Amino acid sequence: MNVSKYVAIFSFVFIQLISVGKVFANADEWMTTFRENIAQTWQQPEHYDLYIPAITWHARFAYDKEKTDRYNERPWGGGFGLSRWDEKGNWHGLYAMAFKDSWNKWEPIAGYGWESTWRPLADENFHLGLGFTAGVTARDNWNYIPLPVLLPLASVGYGPVTFQMTYIPGTYNNGNVYFAWMRFQF
């Protein structure tokens, strides 16, 4: 192998190492922002929120009919949260909720949610959101062992009332659940 090939390989590896360093620096910056947003939402909430679970829907393409026929898709429950809107108009929330899961057993969840918010109409009360939630849940069929969750969020709302939703991905006969709730801001 001639010298130019060694230089090319060394240069390629060196550039990759520099890139990895930048990725970790950005990850550290992102985590700092994440922690600061949680702290600010906890310390300076603008609203108190009431959460009312509305629907759980198991994707029919991903389940046997005999399973979906047995599942609960009316998730009785409720929750409470703190929230705020940041200077960009994005929503931040801390919440705790408990609801009846697919097996009609209680499932608690608590976490932080963030949504980038758009107000596409002249009426500023109408808003759409897209973001994520990070938290912890526990299920009866997992012996209530705390499980971390990182899920997408989407919403449509008017004024203090928001219909918020997520999708829990999964495999055949497991996961693939649409879950939605109403959020009322006070």
UniProtKB/Swiss-Prot annotation:
Q: What is this protein called?
A: Lipid A palmitoyltransferase PagP
Broad class of the protein's primary localization: membrane
Gene name for this UniProt entry:
pagP
Q: What class of enzyme is it?
A: transferase
Q: Say yes or no: keyword Acetylation present.
A: no
> Mutating residue 172 to F: what's the consequence?
Does not cause significant structural perturbations of the enzyme, but induces a 2.3-fold increase in the palmitoyltransferase activity
- Where exactly is the site Role in the phospholipid gating? 172
Oligomeric state and interaction partners are given as: Homodimer.
Query: Where does this one sit in the cell?
Result: Cell outer membrane
Reaction it catalyzes = lipid A (E. coli) + a 1-hexadecanoyl-2-acyl-sn-glycero-3-phosphocholine = hepta-acyl lipid A (E. coli) + a 2-acyl-sn-glycero-3-phosphocholine; lipid IIA + a 1-hexadecanoyl-2-acyl-sn-glycero-3-phosphocholine = lipid IIB + a 2-acyl-sn-glycero-3-phosphocholine; lipid IVA (E. coli) + a 1-hexadecanoyl-2-acyl-sn-glycero-3-phosphocholine = lipid IVB (E. coli) + a 2-acyl-sn-glycero-3-phosphocholine
- Membrane spanning stretches: none
Q: How is its activity regulated?
A: Inhibited by lauryldimethylamine oxide (LDAO) and dodecylphosphocholine (DPC).
Q: What else is known?
A: Overproduction leads to camphor resistance and chromosome condensation.
Site feature Role in lipopolysaccharide recognition: at which residues?
Answer: 67
Q: Which UniProt keywords are given for this protein, alphabetically ordered? A: Acyltransferase, Cell outer membrane, Membrane, Signal, Transferase
Q: What is the effect of changing residue 113 to M?
A: Mutants with longer amino-acid side chains at position 113 preferentially transfers laurate chain (12:0)
Q: What is the effect of changing residue 101 to A?
A: Drastically reduces palmitoyltransferase activity while leaving expression and membrane insertion intact
Q: Which family does it belong to?
A: Belongs to the lipid A palmitoyltransferase family.
Q: What is the effect of changing residue 155 to A?
A: Fully functional
